[in-house]
Design a protein with these regions (language model features):
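The beta1-alpha1 cofactor-binding region of Rossmann-like NAD(H)/NADP(H)-dependent oxidoreductases
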Residues: 78, 99-113, 143, 255-256
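Conserved mid-core segment of classical short-chain dehydrogenase/reductases
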Residues: 104, 109, 132-147, 166, ...
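Catalytic Tyr-X3-Lys loop
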Residues: 139-158, 175, 199, 248
Length: 274
């Protein structure tokens, strides 16, 4: 058996987007048990969209370990969100969870209001929620899918940032999750890749506009990461070999990505924006 034929994960598929972490085998690694915090975000408040599972969950836990109170949003994965809330609270930090459609501008405004109302302030905004729907041909991407993908992946960032800005003071951070597909492209994720490219341009442009206000804007572009979106997007056979085609020959785990967000959220990245 060649390396390309070896299974990276047990074959599995979920019919519901954005997927449920509780149904995955194996569960993604999010808790970063070996991570040693040093109070880099002490007293801060972070709002993380899509924070119930995957990268967002790992970021929420890492931020909490560094001293931040956390607000997370999710779609309808109540079990995952409750688990994340408990893990954050185990660090001694506060956590609120908010269910809704991030593609709805009204919800974007509401989550900012609730974060400030319940946690007292907002220092770090992580725009992380996203969705993807593979299609083999561009002709198979419906108008509904196209609009939905853009609403969730990029329009939501505009709406959430606009709502957050009145509360973000000098030194605040905005961190957007893009993807390696923004640079490499993807033949079966054309609409998704287009939104991720838009996020790169959005991040660079917004960083220039907010520089005078001393608000830092950056993005993280992960490669293949083992999150619920994977079994919810691809066939069982595709999932079995997910991540095997990259140089490290495996997918990343969420808690291997989270330290990038910690770096961008704290003073260590004081000379980085855009």
């Amino acid at each position: 058996m060649s390396d390309q034929d070896k299974e990276a994960f047990p074959p599995q598929h979920q019919d519901h987007q954005p997927g449920r972490e509780a149904a995955m085998n194996p569960r993604p690694e999010s808790s970063a048990r070996s991570y040693t915090p040093c109070g880099k975000l002490e007293g801060r408040v972070a709002l993380i969209t899509g924070g119930d599972s995957g990268i967002g969950k790992a970021v929420a836990i890492a931020f909490a370990k560094e001293g931040a109170d956390i607000a997370i949003t999710y779609f309808d994965e109540h079990e995952d969100a409750e688990e994340t809330r408990k893990l954050v609270e185990q660090t001694g930090r506060r956590c609120i969870v908010m269910a809704g459609d991030i593609g709805d501008a009204k919800f974007c405004r509401q989550i900012v209001h609730s974060t400030v109302s319940d946690l007292g302030r907002l220092d770090v905004l992580v725009n992380n929620a996203g969705e993807q729907h593979p299609q083999q041909r561009i002709e198979d991407i419906s108008e509904e899918q196209l609009e939905r993908t853009f609403r969730t992946n990029i329009f939501a960032m505009f709406h959430t940032v606009t709502a957050a800005l009145p509360h973000l003071k000098e030194g605040a951070r905005i961190i957007n999750t893009t993807s390696v597909t923004a640079y490499r492209g993807s033949s079966h994720l054309i609409d998704y890749a287009a939104t991720k490219g838009a996020i790169v341009a959005f991040t660079r442009s917004l960083s220039q506009q907010l520089a005078a206000r001393k608000i830092h804007v950056n993005a993280v572009a992960p490669g293949p990461v083992w999150t619920p979106l994977i079994p919810a997007s691809f066939s069982a056979e595709q999932v079995a070999h997910f991540g095997a085609d990259v140089p490290l020959e495996r997918a990343g785990q969420p808690d291997e990505i989270a330290p990038c967000y910690v770096f961008l959220a704290c003073g260590d990245s004081s000379y980085m924006s855009g």
